[in-house]
Each structure stands twice: as structure tokens, then as C-alpha cells.
């Protein structure tokens, strides 16, 4: 039996992957006359890639047939059950011809042209959306991790309802012919009350509401952004909502106070709201009365109504919050700091704004807080500022790609403060500092927007004032990210980037192709979409700066600040380095050397880390005998989630007598580099450990070896200065030492050490991971 379907038709997205369309399977099917076949006539879901298949079958020309490979457990309200006694089954030819005529009439109408045009537009928008997703996702594991984070816990199914007598009798009737009441009892029997003794029906437990996944976004000085940038940001916000990430936006008008500041904030909130509403299936909601503050104005503001705020977010609205609070005693509107507004919202979403009753049982109070935290998961704290990510003034990199707050916050804050103080000093901006500032990605913005002078001048100079303002902005963004993440679970993360970068990557391929300044063949990844899907920075922080251009889609090896100047931040984990390289630099002459039996090292946890990472048992005693007298240092990330053991190795034939000549020939060697399996590929654990090794502990270089078939070799290759296959073995040698190839003696020492190290695994197999 062929079953036609009337236009218009819509269906759930991504249910099949078959031939006619990449996402939808449409084809005609036949069913046996005595079987029930379920077909979709109309669904209230969003339309995705509507297509029709037309073919001739017998005398029924121009008839349309549809079949969908959909899940069997679709909701009943979108299913239509075609039974053998239906008119379609009794007189299929007549009905099919009528349906064909209706379809022909519909196809010739002007309304159909409008609908088809709308569908084509939707299809184009969907295509752009999926291209953005495909260009942002990196691996299948990351996609699975994203789906696992957003997957709702399944509701427990209740008892099946008791079947009514009428349904039971009807189900037992013979099928094939509609014989009315011939085989059944009279209507009076069916309609008469039935007295039975059953168990009392248990009321069905309420389904646990789905947890709201949320991104808190602060947009700085949107009044300085043109409409194309605002539209690009609005498009990205719409895509985030579509991917299951609700968006709450704080509008920061800058350093404007009083009535003018409130007016600017409201105008820009309306501007962003209008841009969001222009996106397909997107809605916005401006919430002016979101915050309250004490009359004295001390402390953070508080959220007036959690229910109003969450209900709008749960309904799929992009909520815009101007930094306006109302005083509690004598209600009046006052302008508050946008950072304070963002922190107040963070505190509310984290469930920490709850004021418990002192007389209440602590267990009850704790349960109340847990219930609040189950409602919302604040996954991302995003700062969109024209200054972009956090710049770096030390080391080879010009910006911080990833910041582990537990380890680096104080160091980076002090670094920015020192540069700011040097800018504002009486001597003026030195030539070196000025050159460093000019090499940073935000200098382009400063030169273009704020008219930085060509050469440093003595204070008070406009350039010095501008640089002070720029560095103050970076310090504020860094503090905001640190303070917000301190209130959130360790799984939450932050992003500091520019709205221009988000807007640029949100453009359609046609717009990108029309831009003459666009370079490269790949579509640029949207940092916000990429971070949502992967929970990683756009570029690995351990990647050498000279190689970042090859991985940012530009197709060249040049460093491209447009595609790399986004800072990804996490509350992170503490990093322990023994001995402390800042007080005791790691030198070959250092005595006495650290041993793995040292009380500052948790040896059982270190062994567990190694065995879990390599998936092999370690011969602990043999390993200690080999390395304890050679330890250069140990790096431990977090609670032994990752780590590295580094040694000083003497090349074969060189006496280890403690002399200067012997120490000069010693090779810095990475003996073990391990990350727990559950932390591999996420959280930046490997990057944190590797960066500490090559930037802090061994800045002059280190070497290691890996078997040729090790899947991690690609990661090693990208981060090393060179690699060398050891002939006659299954080994590859890697190093980060600059100029090693030109130093023949040192290169031979490196190779000899990598060949001579003996394994210490319990299985005694010469297969080294």
C-alpha cells in the first residue's frame, strides 16, 4: 500500500542519514495489506530540509510518496495510524488521485512559491549552521563529550496504565474487515460502569526538570561596534541557544555614570535585542529590573527575582541585562559596575546567594542550596571586549591562549601591573616596552581606534594614557574571569575574546569570500562555538608560537592574531614543581638531588598515575634504583592528574664523577610523561605539564623518546624543535633544544642516551610507551 502525504510537511531533524538528502531519507515503500503502517502526516517540529520525491507508478502520474526512517517511539500526537479498514486502504487509487490533484494545485499557487522560498532560505541558514559546527568540532570524542554534558537524565517510567475492558475486547476482535458490533457486545454493555478491586493507582512522580545550561556573557562598550559586528555576535548567540546553551548577556556601556550611562545601556540592550530577534527562530528579552542594591551602595547587587530570570532563559530567550539596579529602601534606578552585575548573576546562578535561616537545620539548608544548583549549570563565563584576549609580555608568545587560574593568575596579574607601571613611570614608555606593546594583537585596535602616537613621548602623553587604559581593561577582564570561576565548579570555563573575532567567524561563506582581506582556504572557527563543543582553547597553549599559524586555518606559518588572540581560562588545578625552579634552578651540578622517596612526593599516587596512563605495571623497585640518583625534578598537576619525571642522563662512556666536564655532557631527559585516562584530551592537563617543563624547568631544551607507532607522536611532533628516527630500532627521538643539529657532539649524546635507557616495566617486555 502506497501512502501519500499532503503538503506542507515537517519532521524532526537528523533522524536518518540516507541518500536523497544528507540529513533526511525520503523514499516510497510498500506495506502488506494486513499490516499496520505508521506514517507521519504533520509534525509540529521545526522544518529541516523539506524535499519531495516524484515518480510515476502505473496510472497514478505525478503522485508523491514519502517514507521516513524515524524512531519507533515518536510521540503519539505526531503519528497517524493507517489501518486496513480506513478509506485509504479500501480505495487507494481514488484517494491517491485526489491527493495528487491537491498537490498539483498547491504546487501552482503563489503561496507555495513563498513557502518554497522560505524553505530554501531556511535550508541555506541550516547549511551555514552545520558548516560552523563542522569547522568548530575537532574530534568524535569531543562531540560525544559535548552531548554527554548536555544530556538530560532519563525520567523513570511509571506503571503502565491498566487496559480498559473496552480496549481489551476491541483488541481481540478479528482484523481485516470492519464488521461493526457483530462480534462485540452492545454499546450499553461497554458504557456501563464496571466495579473491580484494583490496587490504588500510584500518582506518577513528577519528571525532574531538565537542567539549564547557561553562558553568562558581558559585552563591553557595544556603542563602539558597528552593526555588522553586532549582527555577527547576535548570530552566534542564536547558534549557542540552538545548541542547548542559554545566554544571559550583561551590557557594559563603559565608564559612563548617571542618567547618560543608564540611557546608553538601555539603548545598546535594545540594539542587541533587535539583532537577536532578526535571527531565525531567535527571541530576546530585556530585563531592566533584574538587580537590587542597598541604599549605601556597598557590596555586590543582588538578583530581584530568580524565577523571572530563569523562566525567560528556559523559554529560549536571550536575556539582556543592563547594569541598572534599584535601591531597596527608596526605590530608584542607579548605575552599577557591569563587572559587579556579572558577578551578582554568577552568584545567583551558582546557588550561592541563598540566605539561610540561622535556626534552620544545616542539612535542610544544604539540600536547599543543592536544589538551586540542580536548576542551573553556569558552564561558560564569556567576556567580549574589543581589547581581545590577555596579552603576554614574557616568553616567546604574544598572548595567553590558555590560563590555568590556580597556577598563573597572580603571575599574569603582576606581569600586567608591572607593564602598566612602566608605562606610567616618569621616564615615559621605554623603547623596549613600546616595541613589546606594538607587537601584541591589541595594538592594532589601539592604533586604529585610539590613535596611538608613532613614537613614545615623555609623559603626560596620549599614548601612555591610552596604554594605561588598555592594560587596566585587561586587568579588569582577568579579575572578572577569576572571581566568577572561583564561585563555579571546576568544570566551568571562561573565554576572553573580541566581538570582532566572534563576528568575523560567524559570517557566511559568501560574505567571507567577498572580503578581499580574507586569507586562507578554511572556514575560520568561531571561538564561542568551538569552546562549547570542545571545552578547549582554539589552539593548544603548549604549541610553539611559530607553529600556531599552521593550525589556525590561515594556510601559512605566520602568526595570525585575528585567529589566535582568544584567551581560554579555567579555574584549573594547582601545579607542583619539585624542586622549585625559581629558587633552585634545575642544573646538572645540583646536589643533593631529589629522590622519588622524598616525603614531598606521594609515591603510591605517582605510581598509580604512571600505570593508569601507560596501561602497564611498573617494576617500582627497579625503577627507583635506576632514576633516584638522576632525578632533575618532578612536575605534578592537580591531585596527581598528570605529571612528568625528568632526569639528568650521562651518555654511555662518559664518567659520572661529578666533575664539571661530566656535568657539561649530561643530557636533560624526559623519563615519564603521564596523564590519567579520564583527564586525557580535556582540561588542558597535558598542556599545563608540558609548558611547565619547556618554559620553566628546562627553557634551554629537553629530549625524550617514543616508539614509532605511538599515537601521541603527532602531539609530540607539533611541540618539538626536531625529531630523529633511531636507525635499527623502533624509536623516535624528540627534542626542544635550539640549535641541536648544528652541535654534533651534543646531538650524538642525545641519541646515545635515548638508545641506552632500559625499561622498568613489570612484564619485562622491551616495548616502551
Swiss-Prot record:
Keywords: Acyltransferase, Amino-acid biosynthesis, Mitochondrion, Transferase, Transit peptide. One of its GO terms (biological process) is ornithine biosynthetic process. Residues 159-172 have a biased composition (Polar residues). One of its GO terms (molecular function) is L-glutamate N-acetyltransferase activity. It comes from the Eukaryota. Residues 590-759 form the N-acetyltransferase domain. One of its GO terms (cellular component) is mitochondrial matrix. Residues 150-172 are annotated as: Disordered. Pathway: Amino-acid biosynthesis; L-arginine biosynthesis; N(2)-acetyl-L-ornithine from L-glutamate: step 1/4. Its EC number is 2.3.1.1. Gene3D superfamilies: 3.40.630.30, Acetylglutamate kinase-like (3.40.1160.10). It catalyses: L-glutamate + acetyl-CoA = N-acetyl-L-glutamate + CoA + H(+). It is found in: Mitochondrion. It is an enzyme of class 2 (transferase). N-acetylglutamate synthase involved in arginine biosynthesis. Belongs to the acetyltransferase family. This is Amino-acid acetyltransferase, mitochondrial. The gene is arg2.
Amino acid at each position: 500500500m502506497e501512502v501519500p502525504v499532503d503538503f506542507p510537511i515537517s519532521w524532526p531533524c537528523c533522524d536518518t542519514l540516507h541518500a536523497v538528502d544528507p540529513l533526511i531519507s525520503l523514499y516510497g515503500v510498500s506495506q502488506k495489506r494486513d499490516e499496520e503502517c505508521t506514517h507521519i502526516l504533520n509534525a509540529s517540529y521545526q522544518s529541516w530540509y523539506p524535499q519531495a520525491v516524484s515518480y510515476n507508478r502505473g496510472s497514478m502520474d505525478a503522485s508523491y510518496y514519502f517514507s521516513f526512517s524515524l524512531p519507533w517511539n515518536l510521540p503519539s500526537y505526531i503519528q497517524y495510524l493507517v489501518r486496513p479498514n480506513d478509506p485509504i486502504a479500501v480505495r487507494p487509487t481514488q484517494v491517491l488521485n485526489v491527493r495528487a490533484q491537491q498537490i498539483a494545485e498547491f504546487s501552482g499557487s503563489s503561496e507555495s512559491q513563498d513557502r518554497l522560498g522560505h524553505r530554501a532560505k531556511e535550508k541555506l541558514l541550516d547549511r551555514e549552521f552545520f558548516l560552523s559546527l563542522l569547522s568548530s568540532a575537532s574530534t568524535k570524542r569531543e562531540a560525544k563529550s559535548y552531548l554527554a554534558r548536555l544530556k538530560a537524565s532519563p525520567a523513570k517510567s511509571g506503571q503502565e496504565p491498566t487496559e480498559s475492558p473496552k480496549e481489551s475486547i476491541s483488541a481481540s476482535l478479528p482484523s481485516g474487515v470492519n464488521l461493526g458490533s457483530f462480534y462485540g457486545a452492545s454499546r450499553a454493555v461497554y458504557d456501563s460502569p464496571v466495579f473491580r478491586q484494583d490496587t490504588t493507582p500510584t500518582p506518577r512522580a513528577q519528571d525532574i526538570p531538565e537542567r539549564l545550561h547557561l553562558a553568562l556573557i558581558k559585552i563591553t562598550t557595544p556603542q563602539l561596534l558597528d552593526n555588522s559586528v553586532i549582527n555577527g555576535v547576535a548570530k552566534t548567540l542564536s547558534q549557542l541557544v540552538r545548541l542547548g546553551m542559554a545566554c544571559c548577556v550583561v551590557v557594559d556601556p563603559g565608564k559612563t555614570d548617571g542618567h547618560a550611562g543608564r540611557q546608553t545601556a538601555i539603548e545598546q540592550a535594545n540594539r542587541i535585542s533587535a539583532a537577536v530577534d532578526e535571527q531565525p527562530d531567535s527571541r530576546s528579552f530585556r530585563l531592566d529590573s533584574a538587580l537590587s542594591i542597598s541604599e549605601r551602595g556597598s557590596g555586590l547587587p543582588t538578583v530581584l527575582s530568580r524565577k523571572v530570570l530563569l523562566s525567560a532563559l528556559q523559554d529560549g530567550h536571550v536575556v539582556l541585562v543592563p547594569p541598572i539596579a534599584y535601591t531597596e529602601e527608596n526605590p530608584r534606578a542607579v548605575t552599577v559596575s557591569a563587572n559587579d552585575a556579572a558577578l551578582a548573576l554568577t552568584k545567583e546562578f551558582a546557588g550561592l546567594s541563598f540566605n539561610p535561616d540561622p535556626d534552620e537545620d544545616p542539612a535542610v539548608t544544604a539540600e536547599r542550596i543543592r536544589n538551586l544548583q540542580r536548576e542551573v549549570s553556569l558552564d561558560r563565563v564569556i567576556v567580549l571586549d574589543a581589547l581581545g584576549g590577555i596579552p603576554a609580555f614574557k616568553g616567546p608568545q604574544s598572548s595567553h591562549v590558555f590560563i590555568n587560574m590556580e597556577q598563573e593568575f597572580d603571575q599574569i596579574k603582576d606581569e600586567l601591573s608591572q607593564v602598566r607601571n612602566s608605562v606610567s613611570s616618569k621616564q615615559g614608555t621605554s623603547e623596549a616596552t613600546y616595541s613589546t606593546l606594538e607587537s601584541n594583537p591589541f595594538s592594532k585596535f589601539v592604533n586604529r581606534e585610539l590613535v596611538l602616537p608613532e613614537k613614545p613621548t615623555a609623559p603626560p602623553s596620549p599614548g601612555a594614557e591610552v596604554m594605561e587604559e588598555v592594560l587596566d581593561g585587561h586587568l579588569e577582564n582577568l579579575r572578572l574571569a577569576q572571581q566568577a570561576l572561583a564561585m563555579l565548579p571546576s568544570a566551568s570555563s571562561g573565554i576572553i575574546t573580541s566581538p570582532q573575532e566572534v563576528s568575523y567567524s560567524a559570517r557566511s561563506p559568501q560574505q567571507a569570500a567577498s572580503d578581499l582581506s580574507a586569507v586562507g582556504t578554511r572556514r575560520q572557527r568561531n571561538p564561542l562555538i568551538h569552546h562549547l563543543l570542545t571545552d578547549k582553547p582554539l589552539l593548544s597553549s603548549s604549541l610553539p608560537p611559530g607553529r600556531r599559524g599552521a593550525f589556525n586555518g590561515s594556510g601559512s606559518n605566520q602568526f595570525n592574531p585575528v585567529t589566535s588572540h582568544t584567551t581560554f581560562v579555567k579555574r584549573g588545578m594547582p601545579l607542583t614543581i619539585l624542586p622549585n625552579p625559581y629558587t633552585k634552578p634545575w642544573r646538572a651540578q645540583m646536589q643533593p638531588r631529589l629522590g622519588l622517596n622524598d616525603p614531598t612526593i606521594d609515591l603510591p599516587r605517582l605510581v598509580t598515575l604512571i600505570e593508569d596512563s601507560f596501561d602497564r605495571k611498573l617494576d617500582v623497585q627497579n625503577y627507583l634504583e635506576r632514576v633516584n640518583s638522576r632525578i632533575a625534578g618532578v612536575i605534578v598537576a592537580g591531585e596527581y592528574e598528570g605529571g612528568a619525571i625528568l632526569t639528568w642522563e650521562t651518555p654511555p662512556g662518559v664518567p659520572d664523577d661529578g666533575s664539571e666536564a661530566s656535568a657539561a655532557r649530561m643530557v636533560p631527559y624526559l623519563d615519564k610523561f603521564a596523564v590519567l585516562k579520564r583527564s586525557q584530551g580535556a582540561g588542558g592537563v597535558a598542556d599545563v605539564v608540558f609548558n611547565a617543563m619547556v618554559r620553566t624547568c628546562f627553557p634551554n631544551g629537553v629530549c625524550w623518546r617514543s616508539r614509532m607507532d605511538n599515537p601521541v607522536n603527532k602531539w609530540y611532533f607539533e611541540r618539538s624543535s626536531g625529531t630523529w628516527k633511531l636507525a635499527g630500532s623502533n624509536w623516535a627521538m624528540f627534542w626542544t633544544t635550539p640549535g641541536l643539529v648544528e652541535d654534533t657532539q651534543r646531538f650524538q649524546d642525545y641519541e646515545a642516551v635515548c638508545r641506552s635507557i632500559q625499561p622498568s616495566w613489570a612484564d619485562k617486555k622491551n616495548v616502551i610507551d
